[in-house]
Structures are given as structure tokens and as C-alpha cells.
Amino acid sequence: MPVMGCSVCSAFAELSRWAHGYPGGQTDAVAIEGDLWQLNLQILDVLEIDHASFVNFVFLGKGLTCIPWGTRGEFFTSWIQGLLERCSCPSVDIHKQLFYYGIYMCYFLTVYLLLYPSPVIIKYARSFFRGEQLWHLLCKFEWVIEKFMEYVFKINFNHPVIKINEGDLESYMFLRKKLKRQYLTPQLAVPPLFTRLPPSLQFIDEGHTHLDTHGEALASALKSCCEDVPCGSPFDSMVKNLALRCALSHQFSVIPVSDQSPNIVTQIREKILSISVLACVVRVPILSATVWSLVETKRPTFFVYCGECKHCLNFGKGKFLKVNFNPTHAFYCRDQKEKQCNVCATTGRIYCSFCGSADIHTASLTQMLDGVPIIRAVMANNAAFMLDTAQRSVDFILPCLGTHAKCEGSVLRRLSLLQLLYLTLNASELMCARCQS
């Protein structure tokens, strides 16, 4: 019998009341969500497991410090025995039952509360506690979770819920080849302007709204061929931008990797990969107190770069020494066209001429960030990722730290990566010709 005042017995009573109190399949999931959170936290507290650590264990597979998971069952049994020895309550059978069932029940409830609020999970969890899958407790933990996933999601899946591949990033630089996709994005169409606007607001020169007979006939023939105007997929574009912004705002994001993924998923994956890998800037370590003080008083010199392709848009127009990705990489530039800013004559918006993005940013070559000086070296392209050897030489734009009234603001240096890392040992290396004279 449960003992009054015992936290383990109290948690067992709550769990038993929940498992037997409602008929399976007739409970409103939204109405009991608060009770499930409380029940989950109560069981974890009895098991002496931190909630955040358990969530990381369920979804990311991070080990729990309190449970030495292993391939053999005695590890789990020794953990249970340790919990029993710390309890003074005489209801040992109830304690043992809660400890054995509790870790699985918390796993099921965590998946329900944070991933998939399906009544199927509630039904499975209740039947599990009532002993309908009692023989599962004789099997390994991973096998029990695999059967739970198979029952709920109808697929073969095992622990943890989210798999993280820690392979080298270069292994995901897919070859430049066209993929045969089975998904086709539907294109939308809208009524043409002449059905929605008067002639004075259409694309007709002012003062020439009246057409002659031949002009009217031609316009009528053209209108009969334009019952609608294609406008692409604005909804897909909106969803893609929202998903991309949301993924970039978090430290981690999970994107499916498959040749059969919908086109919108592929575009999001490629953009996240490119934004995370491409760069035209290298941070230069400051090794001299003189350079430190010069950066503090230096008026910043700005450069312009694209937020998507990460090319510097006001440097690189010419023959500069640079590194590039291998021709088999997705980011290899085959056209090598000039990079600059294009300005729309109608809206005034600025676009990157290299990739067409309107995500244009500016940054300074020198900056004080939380009291720490920063020096940035800018390359002529976006392949800073390929600076993999200390002897590789590249042309860099660096800030001029001089104080001449007609200072040019920046200097061009051809340096190896090793020279760049030790450049700040001598402040004169970061001065233009006018400041040195």
C-alpha cells in the first residue's frame, strides 16, 4: 500500500490515477496538457533526473550522469537498486515499480509534450503502465524505445529522436548535378492588370490613353491571349523565407537531407549551408599593445558585403590573388563575373549583382566589441573556408591604422595565412603609404 508523505508513493498514486482514470482515446489532449507536464516533472524529480538533461537525452542522445547506460542490464539494475537504498519507505514493491516504469513513462510523455501530441502516445503510455507490455521490461532500453517509435510513427526508428551526424562539413558539399525530384511546385496565376485597373493606371504613356482602330484591335487580341498572368509561387517564397529566418535565428536546426526532398526544403538547406560556410572575412589576432590602442582611436572604414553569397561588393573587381572552392564543390564559381551593387531604378532597392539577393550589409574593418578591439581582413571572394594551409597566399584588404589627414583608410597586402596571423606584431604593416611617410 502507498505510504502517506512518501514522495515516491505519491508519484506512483498520481501516475496510477492518470493511467486508470480515463478511458483510452476519449481524453482531450489540450485539456490535460498541464497535468501531463506536472506528472512528468514529478516523476523526474523522484528519479533524481534534471528535466533539461532528460530532454537532451531523449532528443539528442546525450548521456545522463545519474544513469550509466550500457549494453548490459546490470547498469540499469544497479541504478534502480541505488534509488531503493536511499528510500526509507517500507513500500519497496511500489518504489521498484515506479522506478522501472518511470523512466519509460517520462520518455513517452516528453515525446508527446515536445514533439508529437498524439492520442496514440497517451494510449500506449497508459497500456504500458497497466502492464499490457510487461514483458518489454525484460528487454534492453533501446529495444523498448524502438517498439514505441514503431507503434506511434509506423516506422523503424530508435533512440535518440534526433540523429546528429558529426562528419566533416566538406562531405556535404554536394556535386553539381541535377537531381531528379518527384515534387513539382505549383505555379499560381493572377488576373491581368487590364481587368483590375483603368487605362490611366496601366502601363500607357500619359496623354495617349486613346487608341485608334488598329490599336484597339491589337489590344483586344492581346487581351484575349492573357486571361491570367503567372506570378510564380508567392506562398512558397513566403514559407521559405520564414523557415530560413527561423532556422538562422537558432544555434541548431534540423533540415532533411534527401534527393527526394521538396524543392523548398532543398533551397532552405542549401541557403543555410552557404550562409554558414561562405565568408570573405578573416579575423586578425591583435598581438601588440600599440595596435590595440590604435584600433581604439581609429575611425572605422566600412566595406559592403552580401548576406547570402558573402562576397565583398566593393573589393574584388580586378585580378587579385585568391583561393577558391574545388570544382566539385557546390560553391565553386564558374562564371567569375564582377561583383558590385545594382540599384533598382524603380524602387531604389540595392541588390547583389552576383546572386541577386537584396540582403546587403556593411561592416567595419576595425571595431571595438565589448571593449575588445577587432581587426578584419577582407578577401576578394567568399572562399575564406579554403584557407587551410599556413603558406597559402591571398590578397587582403586591411584597415590603415595611421593618423594622416589624407589617410586612404585601407591597405592592400599580399600575405600568406601565417603572415596574416602575426601581422599585428608591427603596427607599420597596417599603414598606407601616406601614413608611413
Swiss-Prot record:
Which keywords are on file for this protein?
Host membrane, Membrane, Transmembrane, Transmembrane helix
Q: Where in the cell is it found?
A: Host membrane
Query: What is one GO biological process annotated to this record?
Result: viral process
Question: Is Transmembrane helix one of the keywords UniProt gives this record?
Answer: yes
One Pfam family, short name please?
Answer: Herpes_UL49_1
Q: Which domain of life is it from?
A: Viruses
- Provide GO CC annotations from the record: host cell membrane; membrane; viral tegument
Coiled-coil residue spans: none
Q: How does it sit in the membrane?
A: Multi-pass membrane protein
Task: Give the InterPro entries listed for this entry.
Answer: UL49
> Does the keyword Metal-binding belong to this entry?
no
- TM stretches of this protein: 102-122, 272-292
Annotated family: Belongs to the herpesviridae UL49 family.
Protein name as it appears in the record? Uncharacterized gene 66 protein
Native organism = Alcelaphine herpesvirus 1 (strain C500) (AlHV-1)
